UniProtKB/Swiss-Prot annotation:
Organism whose genome encodes this protein: Jannaschia sp. (strain CCS1)
Protein name: Large ribosomal subunit protein uL14
InterPro entries registered for this protein in UniProt: Ribosomal_uL14, Ribosomal_uL14_bac-type, Ribosomal_uL14_CS, Ribosomal_uL14_sf
A Pfam family of this chain: Ribosomal_L14
GO cellular component: cytosolic large ribosomal subunit
The gene coding this protein: rplN
Stated family: Belongs to the universal ribosomal protein uL14 family.
Function recorded in the entry: Binds to 23S rRNA. Forms part of two intersubunit bridges in the 70S ribosome.
Gene3D superfamilies: Ribosomal protein L14
Length: 122
């Protein structure tokens, strides 16, 4: 469950290390984002010579949350930390690699590129 001011890890090699959610997209009064939702983030920490710089405002998709995600079959999955993948203007990942596992729910939201790049899909 991601809301404004939430800090997230970045799970790709776009150059950002930490980002902060500044808006949850999908309605004017929407408060929370879960796995597969697109948010607007500000880059708080970045590596030198990366594709994004500190202070950049970008779109990102949430790939892992500490709040559990309920599934149709009754199971739930949760992670230790919140993580996101930075997106470009075409809603494709900016990086060429994804670090760590991602959840199956991204497939239903048409983030196939992230699914194919991820080392593990849970």
């Amino acid at each position: 469950m991601i809301q404004m001011q939430t800090n997230l890890d970045v799970a790709d090699n776009s150059g950002a290390r930490r980002v902060q959610c500044i808006k949850v997209l999908g309605g004017s009064k929407r408060k929370y984002a879960s796995v597969g939702d697109v948010i607007v983030v500000s880059v708080k920490e970045a590596i030198p010579r990366g594709r994004v710089k500190k202070g950049d405002v970008r779109k990102a998709v949430v790939v892992r949350t500490a709040k559990e995600v309920r599934r149709e079959d009754g199971t739930a999955i949760r992670f230790d930390r919140n993580a996101a993948v930075i997106l470009n203007n075409n809603n494709e990942p900016m990086g060429t690699r994804i670090f760590g596992p991602v959840v199956r729910e991204l497939r239903a939201k048409n983030f196939m590129k992230i699914i194919s790049l991820a080392p593990e899909v849970l």
